[in-house]
């Protein structure tokens, strides 16, 4: 029996009751779900559910493990948005904050770092952007935002082979990962904020079931070229945070409060005019 199990067994009953009460409060904030497919991620559960039809009790449900944002500095936001397209063999456009904090020191120590990581310099992000030669002035141009770094499609790509896009103000998305060993961990808040999925091919089959066959999806994965597929009908995506939730078998499951949101909500509920930001995520995060 591990330490985590022992700690869970030692949680007082009144605290477990509070967890359930907070879950009920969060459910109250959600919009009414229309019939049809949905993709739901419960952040502290490190789990994704893809429903063929959320209104049907006997509908097929695709489930898989996920990796979410780091608790200390890269928390995955709660949101609701519409998945509109999928990129096969995507480029990874390195965000400026990741460049500044993580890549810049490595570049300064090793000018060959970009080539080693299958990365390149570009003036603008875009699949048709031309690579720019790295030279002595490149680092200063990168600091000023006049050049950018992206990682080419391939085995090293941080996004893996598939990226699932649903425009949102936080610029997060679902994607594959080359770091497959992370899914064997119990605690999986390890990303920069995006959600990494354990079985991206199966999720692509779910999202494209009315458009592409499994063979067509496999063919797109086998071609080392970026290909974008627009969904004929967008799919709602919900990133949710609750530490008490029912699994597909209707069994209650309790999760660790990895982001400390339960404690925040307990305090917020003492003043009905001061609820946590999750209470208003529906109005703030539904992408048009």
Question: Predicted segment positions?
Answer:
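Well-ordered beta-sheet/strand-loop patches within structured domains
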Residues: 3-288
């Amino acid at each position: 029996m591990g330490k985590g199990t022992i700690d869970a067994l030692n949680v007082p009953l009144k605290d477990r009751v509070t967890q359930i009460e907070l879950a009920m409060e969060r459910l109250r904030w959600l919009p009414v779900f229309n019939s049809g497919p949905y993709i739901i991620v419960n952040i502290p559960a490190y789990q994704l559910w893809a429903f063929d039809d959320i209104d049907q009790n006997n509908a097929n449900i695709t489930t898989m493990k996920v990796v979410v944002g780091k608790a200390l500095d890269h928390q995955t936001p709660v949101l609701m948005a519409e998945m509109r397209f999928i990129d096969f063999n995507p480029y990874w456009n390195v965000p400026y904050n990741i460049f500044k904090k993580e890549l810049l020191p490595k570049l300064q120590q090793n000018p060959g770092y970009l080539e080693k990581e299958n990365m390149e310099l570009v003036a603008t992000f875009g699949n048709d952007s031309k690579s720019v030669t790295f030279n002595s002035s490149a680092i200063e141009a990168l600091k000023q935002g006049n050049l950018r770094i992206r990682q080419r499609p391939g085995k090293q790509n941080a996004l893996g082979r598939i990226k699932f896009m649903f425009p949102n103000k936080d610029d997060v998305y679902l994607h594959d990962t080359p770091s497959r060993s992370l899914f064997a961990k119990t605690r999986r808040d390890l990303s920069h904020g995006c959600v990494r999925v354990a079985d991206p091919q199966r999720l692509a089959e779910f999202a494209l079931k009315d458009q592409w066959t499994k063979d067509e999806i496999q063919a797109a994965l086998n071609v080392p070229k970026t290909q974008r597929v627009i969904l004929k009908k967008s799919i709602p995506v919900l990133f949710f945070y609750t530490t008490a939730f029912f699994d597909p078998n209707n069994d209650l499951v309790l999760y660790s409060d990895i982001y400390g949101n339960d404690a925040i909500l307990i305090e917020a509920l003492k003043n009905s005019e001061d609820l946590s930001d999750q209470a208003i995520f529906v109005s703030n995060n539904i992408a048009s």
